[in-house]
Amino acid sequence: MTEVKEYAGQDYDVIVVGAGHAGSEAALAAARMGNRTLLMTINLDMVAFMPCNPSVGGPAKGIVVREIDALGGEMGRNIDKTYVQMRMLNTGKGPAVRALRAQADKHAYHAEMKHTIEREPNLTLRQGIVDDLIVEDGECQGVITNTGARYRAKAVVIAAGTAARGKIIIGELMYSSGPNNSQPATKLTANLPKYGFDLERFKTGTPPRVDGNTIHYDETEEQPGDVEPNHFSFTTPDSAYLDLKNQLSCWLTYTNEKTHEIIKANLDRAPMFTGVIEGVGPRYCPSIEDKIVRFADKPRHQLFLEPEGRKTDEWYVQGLSTSMPEEVQQKILHSIKGLEDAQMMRPGYAIEYDVVSPYQLRPTLETKPLKNLFTAGQTNGTSGYEEAAGQGLLAGINAGLRALGKPGFTLKRSDAYIGVMVDDLVTKGTKEPYRLLTSRAEYRLILRHDNADLRLTAKGHELGLISDERYADFLAKKATLQAELDRLNQIRIKPNDEINAFVESHGDKPLQDGVLAAAFLRRPYVDYQTLLQFIDAPEQPLDRHIIEEIEISLKYAGYIKKAEENVAKLKRMEAKAIPAQIDYDAIDGLATEAHQKLKKIQPETLAQASRISGVNPADIAILSVYIEQGKIAKVQ
C-alpha cells in the first residue's frame, strides 16, 4: 500500500478530536473564549449523536446539565429546544436529590448542536480521522490525520469516546466499529502508549430498538411528562415549555419468568459469560443477562419504552441492554408484555473501547505524560452523555486558557458535581465505566438543581462564556433573592386568632410570642404562598424559581450551614499545596501503599492526597510536616 504523503494544514489555537457530547462542549467553550478552534469528527452526521439512550438528565446527571448551562455550556439549551418529554424526578424527596430528565428527539438534538457549532465564529468543523499527535520536546503541538494533514495548535483535546479502537459484539459476531456501526478510530489511542500513557479496555452496551407501530401500548403503563414547566437552561422561559398534548409519553413494562428462562437457557452464547468480552462494563447500567444472573431472586425487571424522536418510529427499550445473539434478542423481546409482536429494527450490542487511565490526568484534565494535551468523556473512563459534556466543557476551558497563556481553571468537590467527578477520576481512578451518583457528593445539599447558577455563573462570566447581558440578569435575580431573605428575617409575625387557628390545625402549639417570618417558613407545613396569608407580599411578585430558592434556603438552613462549615475545612486543606517536584522517596515514615499511591497519582493539594485510597491520616500528617518544614533540598 502506498504511504500517505503528509502536508502542512492550517494552524489553530485549539484542536478538539471527536464531536460527541464531550467534544462539542470543548470546542464551543474554547472558541467562545476567543480561540481559533478546529473540531475534528469521523463523520459529520454523528455530531452530538445519541448512540445509546435518547435522554438527558436524571439523578446527579440532570444537575450536571444545569452546571454546564450555568458555566456557559450548550447541552441545557440544546435539550430545551429538542426534548419530547420533560419530568422532574424524586419530587417526593429532599432538594439534594431532585433531578430533571428529558426524553430527547435524538435526531433533532444532533442537528441543533451541529448547527450551533457551524454558526460559531471561531470554530471550524471538519470531517476526518486523527491517527496520531504531533509531539515535540514532550509537548503536544497538534494532530496528524489519516489523509496526511498536520494541524498544529497550542492545545489539543481528545474526546474520542467509544470510537477509540471500538469493537462491537453481538453473540458470536465481533467486528471493528464505532458506536451505531460508525467507522472506528483505530490508530489514535494505539499510538498513545509510545508517549507514556497507560490504557484500559472498557465496554458498554445498548438495547435493541423496536418498531413503535408493533408495540401493544394498551398492555403497558403510560408515563407522561410534567404539566408544570421545567427547563435545563436558566435562559429558557416558561413560555417555551411544551404542554402535555405536545409531549410524547414513555411506557412501562416488565420482564417476566419466561424472559428470564430464555436468557438462562442461552448464557452459553452470552459474550459476557463466555469470555469473549474483555472490557469492564458499567456497574450501574448492567446488561439484562447480567441482571438475571446477579439478581436471580428478582421475578421481574422494569423496562421503559422510549420514543427516539418525532420523525421516527424507532423505540428504545431501556433496561434491556444486551449483547446476546440476534435470534435470542428477538425471543427475549417477544416474551415481554406489550412486545409480543414487536419487530426489532436494530439489535442490541456491546462495544469495547480504549480508555486513558485517569490517574494520568490533572484536575484541569490536562494529561501528565504530555503537556498541552487534554482528554474528556468516555476517553477518561466515564459513562453517560452528561458526564462527558461536563468534562468536555472543563477540558475546553482549560485548553482555551492554555492557548491564551492564562492559568488553568478547576472545580472543587464543593463547587459542582463536575468537580466531584473530576476529583474522583484523578484521585481514585476507576476500573469500570464511572457514573455520577448523588451519593458520591458529600456536599450534595449545596450542589442542587436549583442553585447551579448561584454556584457557577460568576465563574462562567469571568471565563468569557456568560454574556454581560445574561450576567446582569443573574445579578438582578441574586439581589431579589437576597432582598426577600433579608425582608423575611426582619418581619415579625404576631400571635392572633387567625394564625393560631392555622398553627393548631396542623397539630402545633399556638404562638405565645412573635416569630420571624423566616423562622415561621421553616415549619414543615408552611410554604411561601401560605406565609403570604399572614404577611405583606413583596412590592414585586417573585418568580417561582426565586420562591423555590427561598424555601430551600430557609427550610434547610441548619443542614446547609453544617455543609458550608465542612466546605470551609476542605478549602483550608485545599490551600495547602504540594510542591510539584516533591520527592516522595525522600520522605521517611510513609506507609508503603501511601508512598506508591502518592508517587503514582501526584496529588496537587493535601486535601486531594487525603482522598486517595490507601493514604491514611498518619501519612497526611507526615506529608504536611515535611512540606511545612520546607525541606527545599528534598522537595526540589
From Swiss-Prot:
Record's subcellular location: Cytoplasm
PROSITE patterns with a match to the protein in the record: GIDA_1, GIDA_2
Chain positions recorded as NAD(+) binding sites: 281-295
Keyword Protease: no
Protein residues bound to FAD: 18-23
SUPFAM superfamilies according to UniProt: FAD/NAD(P)-binding domain
TM segment ranges: none
Molecular function GO labels: flavin adenine dinucleotide binding
Main location: cytoplasm
One Pfam family this sequence matches: GIDA
Function: NAD-binding protein involved in the addition of a carboxymethylaminomethyl (cmnm) group at the wobble position (U34) of certain tRNAs, forming tRNA-cmnm(5)s(2)U34.
Assembly description: Homodimer. Heterotetramer of two MnmE and two MnmG subunits.
Record's protein name: tRNA uridine 5-carboxymethylaminomethyl modification enzyme MnmG
Protein's organism: Levilactobacillus brevis (strain ATCC 367 / BCRC 12310 / CIP 105137 / JCM 1170 / LMG 11437 / NCIMB 947 / NCTC 947)
